[in-house]
Structure formats: structure tokens, C-alpha cells
Amino acid sequence: MLAERDTLEKNYCELFEVPVDGRSNDGDAMLLQEALRGKDNEIRMLEERLAVSSKNVERLNDELLGANLEANVLGQKLQDLQQEHDKLLERWMQRVRVEVDKMNAQLE
């Protein structure tokens, strides 16, 4: 029975250390509270940075979307101009062929 009591007391002391010098843990609690306040401030600052970063990402996505739209419009315009150029070149080549044929006919 005494051995059982000693074991219980030993386990209790391991779980709940009693300060030997009689000091309370107020100093430790204050240090921990100060550390907690510091971490809370750090969290708040990181949340603010995250919010700013999110706004920047949103703004950049909007700019990227606008640039993609502009690139698509310019790509279509380029394709249209290339088709027009090809048609004009074909008409010009046809005209030159006709003139060359006329000149050849006159020389014969």
C-alpha cells in the first residue's frame, strides 16, 4: 500500500512539477503570453501580405487576360492581312503573265 502511494506520488510529481524554490510560474506565463502576442502579430502581418499578394495576382491575371485577348485580335488581323496579300500577289502575277504573253505574241 505504501509502495502504491509512493508510485502515485512519483507519477503526480512527474506530471505536475511543483517548483522547488516556491516561485510561481507567473514569469513563465508572462514570457509565453509575450511570445503568443508576437506570434499573433506575425500572423496578422502575414495575413496582410497574403491579402496584398492575392490582389496583385488578381491584377496580373486581369492584365494577362487582356494581353491574351489583344494577341488573339492581332493574330486574326495578321491572318486576314496575309490572305489579302496572297490574293493581291496572285492577281498581280496573273496580270504580269497576261502582259508577258502579249509581249511574246508581239515578238512572234
UniProtKB/Swiss-Prot annotation:
GO terms for molecular function: Atg8-family ligase activity; identical protein binding; protein-macromolecule adaptor activity. It is a peripheral membrane protein. It is found in: Preautophagosomal structure membrane. Pfam families: ATG16. Keywords: Autophagy, Coiled coil, Membrane, Protein transport, Transport. InterPro entries: Autophagy-rel_prot_16_dom. The keyword Coiled coil applies. Its main location: membrane. GO terms for cellular component: Atg12-Atg5-Atg16 complex; phagophore; phagophore assembly site membrane; vacuole-isolation membrane contact site. The keyword Membrane applies. GO terms for biological process: autophagosome organization; autophagy of mitochondrion; cytoplasm to vacuole targeting by the Cvt pathway; piecemeal microautophagy of the nucleus. Residues 28-94 form a coiled coil. Homodimer. Part of the ATG5-ATG12/ATG16 complex. Several units of each may be present in this complex. Belongs to the ATG16 family. This is Autophagy protein 16. It comes from Candida glabrata (strain ATCC 2001 / BCRC 20586 / JCM 3761 / NBRC 0622 / NRRL Y-65 / CBS 138). The lineage of its organism: Eukaryota, Fungi, Dikarya, Ascomycota, Saccharomycotina.
